[in-house]
């Protein structure tokens, strides 16, 4: 879906809804991803009572499932709708974290590790591939770089918000709940990240030039 023959410039890409929907969806995913990277061992030791060694072992399984998801996601992205894959991954990120936070069992920890790791891996390849499909390759670097500025805001906000709320409430439940719901809501961004229509910058500047010439 949405493979473009035309190559967008950075300014043309930024004027499309697709650029913003992908960037916001990608950022919403990192609310959970960045928080888990920094806070999962702390959550497991402080809220769930695990030893530091066991918490580190559990956290270490996340990259394993991410690897499996990445391998699978690269294949599926060539066969199926990339937006659909990314959207499903968003639901997996959020629902897995909610399950772990609200159901205090070993099983839900395992469910989270599997769902989150697979979702991270499945979604990751689609982020660059969607941008390449939609905007072409000639300005891919600047487009990706500008997207990264937006994504980084989410990546920083996630762990800071979760940590702040944990200090205020005494546990990570509220913070992780908010981040989970934010990531699940990010599913909507990928629903609306439909292929863009290219409007050349020259076409936008043309009316202004025409008005000046007519004076």
Task: For each feature predicted by the language model, list its residue ranges.
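Helix-to-loop junctions at the C-terminal end of transmembrane segments
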Residues: 70-81, 166-167
